[in-house]
């Protein structure tokens, strides 16, 4: 009888454990996904310079600092604006099917569990006003008007 009670107690303790909360969808989990997934590194201006401290006013609003390479100059999207254009199901579909230019690792996003994407959506929607759009992508043969990071050396072959 003691073994059964101890086993039941152990199972009940595990059920409330964060380890088993992996499939649950929540805003808090979305924050964790954004941190561990590296979303803030590009989509939150100043995040890296602040050594990982999230400025709520800037969180997930994208960046006006571009990434320049053979593909042109790309900018981290304002995810608050994107999320507000879509319902949660639409956000999941977009994230599972998108293909973007570098340096966005869209292939990593496509590998994410659906509950992670739904949690990310809930986190983004909790952040407040969407803010301004980021600059448009600049073709490779044009000079960007914003600061940018030279992401690939100019001597790299195109393609």
Regions found by a protein language model. Name each.
Residues 4-14:
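Sec-dependent N-terminal signal peptides
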Residues 72-87, 91:
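Peptidoglycan-targeting cell-wall enzymes and recognition modules
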Residues 88-96, 114, 118-121:
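An amphipathic alpha-helix signature
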Residues 23-30:
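Short, intrinsically disordered, charge-biased short linear motifs at domain edges
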């Amino acid at each position: 009888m003691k073994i059964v009670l101890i086993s039941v107690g152990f199972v009940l303790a595990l059920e409330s454990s964060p380890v088993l909360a992996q499939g649950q969808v929540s805003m808090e989990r979305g924050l964790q996904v954004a941190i561990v997934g590296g979303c803030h590194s590009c989509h939150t201006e100043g995040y890296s310079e602040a050594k990982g401290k999230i400025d709520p006013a800037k969180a997930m609003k994208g960046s006006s600092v571009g990434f320049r390479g053979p593909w042109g100059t790309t900018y981290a999207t304002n995810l608050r604006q994107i999320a507000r254009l879509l319902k949660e199901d639409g956000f999941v579909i977009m994230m599972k099917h998108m293909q973007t230019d570098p340096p966005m690792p869209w292939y990593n996003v496509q590998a994410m569990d659906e509950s992670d994407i739904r949690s990310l959506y809930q986190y983004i929607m909790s952040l407040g006003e969407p803010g301004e759009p980021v600059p448009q992508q600049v073709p490779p043969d044009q000079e960007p008007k914003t600061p940018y990071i030279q992401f690939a050396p100019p001597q790299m072959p195109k393609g």
